[in-house]
Amino acid sequence: MKDNERRILLGRVVGGFGLRGEIKIESWTEPRDAIFRYQPWLLRSPTGTESMLNGARGYETGKRLIATFPGINDRNGVEAICGTEIYVPRSALPPPHPDEYYWVDLEGLQVHTLEGVVLGSVSHLFSNGANDVIVIHGERERLIPFVQPDYVKSVDFEAERIVVDWDPEF
């Protein structure tokens, strides 16, 4: 991974599973086990130490995502990396389908109404089960459903702008 390449946080190590070095992973990919498709990983420990890892394997079991990392064979090895964040370069992710977006690509874009009123910039997104929601930080925080074409009219990465059909007083 090049030093200046944008890094995307995909997950983190949350603990051990059993005694043989299996690792519980929290993954923010969709589906959760897609995290294993995007390797090598840049691992960043809670102290800021970084290392590259290739060859992680894993599987889902109930609500858990369980992984094995090369070189970690016991619970002590897992405890040493607990809290480690898992990053990949943005270039490791496949291009999204038309009219689909990676949330991370929307973060930081300015949000304008159809009338040109600037509401703020995208802080982050979350899913409420029915749809995705844009969290906008401006003079106040706003939550706008990311529903095209009802509320989100356009996304323009070159202009770094999202245009929404939204009452600025709401």
UniProtKB/Swiss-Prot annotation:
Signal peptide: none annotated. Gene3D superfamilies: PRC-barrel domain, RimM. GO terms for cellular component: cytoplasm; ribosome. InterPro entries: PRC_barrel-like_sf, PRC_RimM, RimM, RimM_N, RimM_N_sf, Transl_B-barrel_sf. Residues 98-170 form the PRC barrel domain. Transmembrane segments: none annotated. GO terms for molecular function: ribosome binding. Binds ribosomal protein uS19. This is Ribosome maturation factor RimM.
